[in-house]
Amino acid sequence: MPINDFLKELLLIPSVSGDESEVALSLLNCINQRKSKWKAVPEIFHGDKFHDCILLRFGTPRTAVFAHVDTIGFMVRYANQLIPVGGPELIPGTRLVGRDSYGEISCNLVVEGEALFHDFPRKIDRGTRLSFAQEIRIDSEFIQAAYLDNRLGVFSALQLCETLEDGWVVFTTYEEHGGGSMPFLLQFIQATAQVKQALISDITWITDGVHHHEGVVISIRDKFIPRKKFIDRIIQLVQQSGIPFQLEVEAYGGSDGREVQFSPFAMDWCFIGAAEDQVHSPDEKVSLRDLESMVQVYQYLLKEL
């Protein structure tokens, strides 16, 4: 499927968990520029009340779609020590980039046993976040880059906005390092325009049972188990659509769906997303066909659910 310039821009914006303000501003600008061309113009909720999250309410919602805007990365500790944010792959020599009060940073990841360091020649401010250096590669079959998780989930949610008439589209934060924004977002949604079902627009993994070019992944379970009745309904609808899909059953992993399940609200949820190879590395790889089926499934389900 065609990859637009805004996705490429998103991939270049750092947003390590807890530092999502820049990507949120870019996303908000994109929404304001595009919304007049969408089938329905949403009500937009953002600002300090929502930290760096953005909520779009279209019409009379029945379903909410959640896509997290943060990424994994690293944080500078003391001297030249690093600690991970989320679960990045620890590959010695990986190039890391960032910025502190002294200026731009480009360095390499040094791994010594369980200890992590950078090799930048000067001191870096404590608490500085470092991201994988970005290299976007696109051919006729694949997109490969750092942070496809979850820039592609955000991209799919934005594509959904073009045709959506009734529903919530919500851009969340903190997900890669344990979550935290979902409780106040769910509370606001249920107080403003209540829904009983949620879809998680995120990226999952290529495994022995999930493969490139075989369609979007519907997750029956990861570490957490959504309600079978709702998952069965999702599967039945997607079967009727004719859109390619595959089913995932895993013992590990999690998403914003966890916080839906642990919330005080009786909401069903399902994780639906394309699968990537080389997870949480600078070289994440996703099939363009699978991304296309992801976009199609969300547009279909938001009409049918």
Indicate where each model-derived feature is located.
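N-terminal hydrophobic/helix-forming segments and targeting peptides
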Residues: M1-L305
